[in-house]
Amino acid sequence: MKLIVGIGGMTNGGKTTLTNSLLRALPNCCVIHQDDFFKPQDQIAVGEDGFKQWDVLESLDMEAMLDTVQAWLSSPQKFARAHGVSVQPEASDTHILLLEGFLLYSYKPLVDLYSRRYFLTVPYEECKWRRSTRNYTVPDPPGLFDGHVWPMYQKYRQEMEANGVEVVYLDGMKSREELFREVLEDIQNSLLNRSQESAPSPARPARTQGPGRGCGHRTARPAASQQDSM
C-alpha cells in the first residue's frame, strides 16, 4: 500500500514542523521538501513588482521533483534505503511519502498523485510576523512580504480553489501537538480504510443441498400416469 501525503500551504504556516513530527510517527515514511528544488539564484527572474520571483512556480524545478516522486513510486523500499529509512518488518506492505512545500497543488502532473492533501493557513498578520523572525539564506529585502510573498500566496490559492483541487484546510494557529494529532489520526484512518478495501471478502459458506437437489438443477417431475391424464 502506497500513500502520498501533501503538507502544503502558506509560507511560515507550520508545514515543516508538522512534516517532521509525522515523519517520526509514521511507518516506512520518507519525505521530499519542495524547497530543495529551487533553481539557482541567477535563474530567478525579477518581476514587474521589482522583486526576485522566488514565490512563483517557475522558480522551482518541478520536473526534477516529479522525477523524485516517480522514483519513490517505482520502488519505495529502494528509495527508503537510499534515504536512510529502515523498513519496519511489521508494516513492510505500507509505504508513505510526505511532500512538503508552499506550491504543492499548483503543478498539474503532481496533483492527482496525492492520497491526501493538507493546506495550512494562518492570518495575514501572524504570517507576516513569523516571516520577519526567520533567517533565510537569501535575506528578504524590505517590502518583499507585502509586495510579492503575500500577493503570490493569494494568487496561487485562488487558482487552486478555482481548479477544484480538494484539500483539507488546517488552522496553523493551533498548537503543534494538536495539529500533529489531528493529521496523524486522519492519515491512520486513511490507511485503515485502504487496508479494509483491499482485503479479500470472506468466503460465503456453501449452501447445503437437499436430497435429490444438485446445484443449478431442478428435480425432474415423475412422468404423469394414465389416470392423471384422464
UniProtKB/Swiss-Prot annotation:
SUPFAM superfamilies: P-loop containing nucleoside triphosphate hydrolases
Chain sites annotated for binding ATP: 9-17, 130, 134-136, 174-176
Domain of life: Eukaryota
Binding-site list for Mg(2+): T16, D35
MF terms (GO), sorted A to Z: ATP binding; metal ion binding; nicotinate riboside kinase activity; ribosylnicotinamide kinase activity; ribosylnicotinate kinase activity
Top enzyme category: transferase
Involved pathway(s): Cofactor biosynthesis; NAD(+) biosynthesis
InterPro entries named in the record: P-loop_NTPase
GO biological process, one term: NAD biosynthetic process
Record EC number: 2.7.1.22, 2.7.1.173
Cellular component per GO, a single term: intracellular membrane-bounded organelle
Tissue: Predominantly expressed in skeletal muscle and, at a much lower level, in the heart (at protein level). No expression in brain, kidney, liver, lung, pancreas nor placenta.
Binding site for substrate: D35, D36, F37, F38, W54, D55, R131, Y136, T137
Catalyzed reactions per annotation: beta-nicotinamide D-riboside + ATP = beta-nicotinamide D-ribonucleotide + ADP + H(+); beta-D-ribosylnicotinate + ATP = nicotinate beta-D-ribonucleotide + ADP + H(+)
Active site, per annotation: D35
Family stated for the protein in its record: Belongs to the uridine kinase family. NRK subfamily.
Subunit structure of this chain's protein: Monomer. Interacts with ITGB1 alone or when associated with alpha-7, but not with alpha-5.
Name this polypeptide is given: Nicotinamide riboside kinase 2
Gene designation: NMRK2
